Structures are given as structure tokens and as C-alpha cells.
UniProtKB/Swiss-Prot annotation:
PROSITE patterns: TAT
Membership in a protein family: Belongs to the mandelate racemase/muconate lactonizing enzyme family.
GO biological process: cell wall organization; peptide metabolic process
Name of the molecule in the record: L-Ala-D/L-Glu epimerase
Co-factor remark: Binds 1 Mg(2+) ion per subunit.
Needed co-factor(s): Mg(2+)
Amino-acid positions noted as binding Mg(2+) in the UniProt annotation, renumbered to this chain: 224, 251, 276
Length: 383
């Protein structure tokens, strides 16, 4: 039987709200509930393959700092005892990774030194040690390993973490910065399919964007300013105006370098304020308490599911709210992030809906709500 005991010690499960101490989270002392492991032989080697894959966007995607029609991506597969786990690295421009850098990183990863994939903590600690950055590349390995381990366990990760799939949140659907006519068309297209929208702001036409959407729908809106507001009084005034327009939360209102100004805004804000660019990994979470109401966790920034789950647990232990977000991704990474979505307050997991060449079928959005399946691992099948 695979290394069940060691795996259960390191899967980092915690029952949210159970009084887990911050020190326990950081020390990795949170335990998963026991679960049956399918019978597979021991002694085989893990084999990893990877290849570039360009994601094609359905619409031109514009935020405060750039526009694009494609997103570079690298697909990863890890095979063990005839079972394959899938992962991916998505690389939007601001992340600072490229297909070349991801491929070069993955070439350095030697999984054959480990006897089986249930040494998840040791394997991913080794992967993390190979460079100080390359978070999307690390996430690709992490996701594929989690998918593989879940398949060997015969269970989806939401069950391994002890979560209730009926408690998944609605996901936002993102409307990028565009002309009023295009914004109206996009809003009409998605207004009947989603319960909450997300709008990218941070330019001179912010109010026009909101008014344009409000001419079509009164759905709740989450706003991502993408660090676009530089003056704290202006940011606070905008937030008060946005609250009057039915906005329910604000993401990264100001540049990450202006943490004191962000804290000033958050303390007076009538809406919850979430960190995005100010947050990357587990070590950043505690420092943001007080400056933000909550955090937005993205697998491509935090190295994957292992660290994301620790961040969820730590944020709750600190009394912070949690959002799970994404890049433009296939259903592989979206389904991976969805596994812990029952434990979060907000979800922005629409990245797979923004592309026209998804390689996978996985998590679905039904009546605007994230709907998990019971496929083992991260819950995906290749199309």
C-alpha cells in the first residue's frame, strides 16, 4: 500500500472555524480525515511530461495595464502506475513567467528520486527549493500531483479536505475594460447566466463602465481596480460611490507599494477590501491583516493547491475573509482551485469560460454557482 500514514500527516486538512492556531497552520500540523486508498503497487517511478499550449481568448481582454487575445500556457502530465495526473501553468504578462522559463524549470524537476506520489509534502518542498520564483511552473507540478494522488485515493480533493460541495459559492464573471457598446453586449450575454459580475476598473472611465453595466442589469458587482487608484482619498470616494451602485467588494484599490494608504482606505471603507497584487504566498498573509479585509488566492501565484489550502486556513485563523481567483486557464487549473471553494467567501473562477480551446471538462457553473463533480483528484477529464 502507498505511504498512507505519511501522506495523512502532511495533507494539511483543518476543520475551518475549529480554533486552529496560527502557529499550527504555519507548522503544518493540520490533519486530514482518514480516507480509503485504492490498491496500487509500490516501486514504480513517476514520469512527468510537459508541452506548451496557447490559450485563445473569446474576446480581447483589457485591464488597467494591458490588452491581449491569447495567454501562454504549459500543460503538465505526471504518470504513476498507469494513472495520470494533469496540471498547468498559465502565464499572463504581469506574472513575469514565460513558456521558456516554465519549460526550463520543469526540466530541472526530478520526480524519479521519490518512491511514490504520496510523499506530497517532501516532493513539493523539493520543487519549491529549485528556485525562488517560478510560481506558475511550481503550480503546474503541484496540481498534477494533487490530481494524481486524488485519483490513487479514489476521491476528489474537496472530500480529502473534508469540505461540503453544496457550500460552493457563486463565481463572478469578469467584464474587461472596453467601449460602452462592447460592455453592454458582454453584460447582456452573461447577465442571465451568473449571479454576480466582476468589473476591471482603474482607468479614467471607471464610472462610465459601472453606469453602462447598470443600464443593463442590477446584478451584484465585484470591482477589481488592479492597483489603478493612486490617491487614497480618491479611492475612498470611489468606493463610497460604488457602494451606492450595488458593488459588494473591492479588490486591490491601490498599488501594492502603498500599503499604509490601503490600510487607511480599508479602515474607512463601507465595502470589504481584498488583496490581490499585495499577496502572493503564505508568508505574505499575516502581514496583510489590518490592511485588507481579506485575500484573493491564485494558484499560479502561490505555487498551487498545497500552499493555497494553508493560506485559506491561516486567513480564517487570522479572522480574514477569503476569495479564490484565477488567471486565464483551462478547466484543469480552474477545477483544482474549485476543490477548496466551499471554504471561501467569494470566487472568481471564470478563466476557463474566457477561452475557446479548453482541453478539459471539469467543474461547471450551474445557475451561476460553482458545481463540483465527484471525479477523483481535481475532477477533470481530457476532451
Amino acid at each position: 500500500m502507498p505511504n498512507r500514514r505519511d501522506f495523512l500527516k502532511t495533507a494539511a486538512f483543518a476543520t475551518l472555524g475549529s480554533g486552529i492556531a496560527v502557529s499550527q497552520v504555519l507548522a503544518g500540523e493540520c490533519m486530514p480525515s482518514a480516507i480509503h486508498i485504492n490498491k496500487y503497487g509500490i516501486g514504480g517511478k513517476m514520469k512527468m511530461t510537459f508541452f506548451p499550449y496557447e490559450l485563445k481568448l473569446r474576446h480581447v481582454f483589457t485591464v488597467a495595464t494591458y490588452s491581449r487575445t491569447t495567454t501562454p500556457d504549459v500543460q503538465v502530465e505526471i504518470e504513476y502506475e498507469g494513472v495520470t495526473g494533469y496540471g498547468e501553468a498559465s502565464m499572463p504578462p504581469y506574472l513575469g513567467e514565460t513558456v521558456e522559463s516554465v519549460m526550463n524549470f520543469l526540466k530541472k524537476v526530478n520526480l524519479e528520486q521519490f518512491s511514490d506520489p504520496f510523499q506530497l509534502e517532501d516532493i513539493l518542498s523539493y520543487v519549491d527549493s529549485l528556485s525562488p520564483k517560478d510560481t506558475a511552473a511550481k503550480a503546474a507540478v503541484d496540481i498534477a500531483l494533487h490530481d494524481l494522488v486524488g485519483k490513487l485515493l479514489g476521491a476528489p480533493w474537496y472530500k480529502i479536505w473534508g469540505l461540503n460541495k453544496e457550500k460552493t459559492p457563486s463565481t463572478t464573471f469578469t467584464i474587461g475594460i472596453d467601449t460602452p457598446d462592447v460592455v453592454r453586449a458582454k453584460t447582456k450575454e452573461c447577465a442571465g447566466l451568473f449571479n454576480i459580475l466582476k468589473v476591471k476598473l482603474g482607468r479614467d472611465n471607471d464610472k462610465e463602465m459601472i453606469e453602462t453595466i447598470r443600464s443593463v442589469t442590477d446584478l451584484p458587482i465585484a470591482v477589481d481596480a488592479n492597483q489603478g487608484w493612486k490617491d487614497r482619498q480618491y479611492a475612498l470616494d470611489m468606493i463610497h460611490w460604488l457602494k451606492e451602485k450595488g458593488i459588494v467588494m473591492i479588490e486591490q484599490p491601490m498599488p501594492k507599494e502603498q500599503l499604509d494608504d490601503i490600510a487607511w482606505v480599508t479602515q474607512q471603507s463601507p465595502l470589504p477590501v481584498f488583496a490581490d497584487e499585495s499577496l502572493q504566498r503564505l508568508g505574505d498573509v499575516a502581514a496583510l491583516k489590518g490592511a485588507f479585509t481579506g485575500i484573493n488566492i491564485k494558484l499560479m501565484k502561490c505555487t498551487g493547491m498545497r500552499e493555497a489550502w494553508k493560506m485559506v486556513t491561516l486567513a480564517h485563523a487570522l479572522g480574514m475573509r477569503v476569495m479564490v481567483g484565477c488567471m486565464t486557464e483551462t478547466s484543469c487549473a480552474i477545477s483544482a482551485a474549485s476543490q477548496f471553494s466551499p471554504a471561501v467567501d467569494f470566487a472568481d473562477l471564470d478563466g476557463n469560460l474566457l477561452i475557446s480551446n479548453d482541453r478539459f471538462k471539469g467543474v461547471e457553473v450551474v445557475n451561476g454557482k460553482i458545481t463540483l463533480n465527484d471525479l477523483p483528484g481535481i475532477g477533470v477529464m481530457k476532451i
